[in-house]
């Protein structure tokens, strides 16, 4: 057991999907995994291990924001030996070419958080995805016919901003979307020499507020992202 995860050694696979929403983790386990067993209910942050196409995989919620994912991802890596972590979550589009229900593969993640500057206050340490995972996910998405964008995202500490014009300026520089976790996950992966990738479904278009999705859709209908994440996890087995 770790401080925040009640699983025993061996309960968690060495490859895992990480949705922010624990109910999305439950949905993935119930709809995609065979023989899924719940390994964690602490703080209702549900985690499950089962098989997908004969391969042992896990899925666990991480909550919202970089402090939360940092807790769970670190414990998964350090205490349970997880080697491959794929975030499957939502993001808000800021690139005018990116639209609701399309996918973004986060090649790199800029951040306005101090979570990394606590270690490197003198400069901005770049947070990048594992290229092998990125490449596999991109080709799997293309084979599935899913509209997918590859590029930088902004991992933000702020959901409701008072300065939206700053976000829009980033969109003009080619930043695809804003989300709240990838930079912290990538930093932990770099620290511990494991693999990580962020796959995001666009749930909101910050350039066009008429493009949006419901809370229920965010929880249960972004199945392309879930399938691509699972297929990417098992691609090396």
From Swiss-Prot:
GO BP annotations listed: purine nucleoside catabolic process
GO cellular component: cytosol
Keywords per UniProt: Glycosyltransferase, Transferase
One Pfam family it belongs to: PNP_UDP_1
MF (Gene Ontology): purine-nucleoside phosphorylase activity
SUPFAM superfamilies documented for this protein: Purine and uridine phosphorylases
Entry binding sites for phosphate: 20, 24, 43, 87-90
Keyword Transferase: yes
EC id: 2.4.2.1
Record-linked InterPro entries: DeoD-type, Nucleoside_phosphorylase_CS, Nucleoside_phosphorylase_d, Nucleoside_phosphorylase_sf
Positions that bind a purine D-ribonucleoside: 4, 179-181, 203-204
Active-site residues, Swiss-Prot/TrEMBL: 204 (proton donor)
Catalytic activity, as annotated: a purine D-ribonucleoside + phosphate = a purine nucleobase + alpha-D-ribose 1-phosphate; a purine 2'-deoxy-D-ribonucleoside + phosphate = a purine nucleobase + 2-deoxy-alpha-D-ribose 1-phosphate
Family the entry assigns: Belongs to the PNP/UDP phosphorylase family.
Function: Catalyzes the reversible phosphorolytic breakdown of the N-glycosidic bond in the beta-(deoxy)ribonucleoside molecules, with the formation of the corresponding free purine bases and pentose-1-phosphate.
UniProt protein name: Purine nucleoside phosphorylase DeoD-type
Species for this entry: Streptococcus pyogenes serotype M5 (strain Manfredo)
Lineage: Bacteria, Bacillati, Bacillota, Bacilli, Lactobacillales
